Amino acid sequence: MATATQIINYTSTPHGGELINRQLEGAEREALIKEAEAFPKLTLNAWSLSDLELIAIGGFSPLTGFMGEADYTNVVENLHLADGTLWSIPITLPVTEEQADAYELGSKIALYGEDDKLYGVLDLQEKFTYDKEKEAENVYGTTEEAHPGVKKVYEKGNVYLAGPIQLVNRPDHSEFEEFELDPIEVRQMFHDLGWKTVVGFQTRNPVHRAHEYIQKSALETVDGLLLNPLVGETKADDIPADVRMESYQVILKNYFPENRARLAIYPAAMRYAGPREAILHAIVRLNYGCTHFIVGRDHAGVGDYYGTYEAQELISQYEDELGINIMKFEHAFYCTKCENMATAKTCPHDKKYHVHLSGTKVREKLRNGEPLPKEFSRPEVAEVLIRGLRRHREQNGEG
């Protein structure tokens, strides 16, 4: 029988060498829950709560808590933690100056959700202010508030709290219960399936034909595919997570070999940080046990803020430090002449024959109630999306 260490390292070594686990169980958990009744309280928004969870379950290994000033500054300026480990996105806990003044260094803070439920405890080691414009410019490449990630930066409190965390309760993902797998559980799954090489695919969109083509192209060279959709906070116009999850199940069931693809949620908030977020996504998939990671066109982008292949260019600079193989794909399209999916590498035909697909186009057509042509989406997927969005509109009283 395989040991825990053998399972953890079966496919890949976690980022930083150790898969972090800051979840408490049993008597230790019960004791901290009791103690926390006396701790000062802080309510986390959905974004910070998802960060807390990902630190605790090891998705953000080697982080053990919210970043201190040395790590934060190094990440913003140099894409590395203070100890030299590659890390591209600040993972921080913002509060107002008034809130920060209420907490003493060395104290423990009870971390609650907006549902007034206790989720964890922060051991407060640092409080520090930061330059919002610098964070926006360095991390997102712009200071424009029209960028959803930058808007979040400007809306945050002016002080960051830092220190190690412990998790006592999990946020509710019960609607995706079957697919709620921690990094250690995903690694166990790969071990049980005998997958030694696994490609991870990050998405916040329904899987359209271009995605499917890229996933299957990658699958030709590895043992398995981990479809790892983000189900945390996204933009208001993104397709709701429950609808997307239905669409992922349908496409895997109907168009992928049963023993070659698996689905597991990534419970993170979407930052839309483009190239820098592509690096974070690769690190997270390494922690989930993947050996390969797909970076396509405008990865984690929004609007026209990033170049089509800017994420691929940045991640290529750090590939030696990543510990995961990056699979870079050109923009795929449907060629009406080839009558197939293709890229510029495989199709000789003029652009007038190319039907370009994107998550944005799919969302627009669905919002306008337009049918999705077969070049865009598998019919089973289109049906799920149309039905799911209709359900959401009815729930929201939109008819």
Swiss-Prot record:
Its EC number is 2.7.7.4. Keywords: ATP-binding, Nucleotide-binding, Nucleotidyltransferase, Transferase. CDD domains: ATPS. One of its GO terms (biological process) is hydrogen sulfide biosynthetic process. Pathway: Sulfur metabolism; hydrogen sulfide biosynthesis; sulfite from sulfate: step 1/3. It catalyses: sulfate + ATP + H(+) = adenosine 5'-phosphosulfate + diphosphate. GO terms for molecular function: ATP binding; sulfate adenylyltransferase (ATP) activity. InterPro entries: ATP-Sase_PUA-like_dom, PUA-like_sf, Rossmann-like_a/b/a_fold, SO4_adenylyltransferase_pro, Sulfurylase_cat_dom, Sulphate_adenylyltransferase. NCBIfam families: PRK04149.1, sopT. Belongs to the sulfate adenylyltransferase family. This is Sulfate adenylyltransferase. It comes from Staphylococcus carnosus (strain TM300). The lineage of its organism: Bacteria, Bacillati, Bacillota, Bacilli, Bacillales.
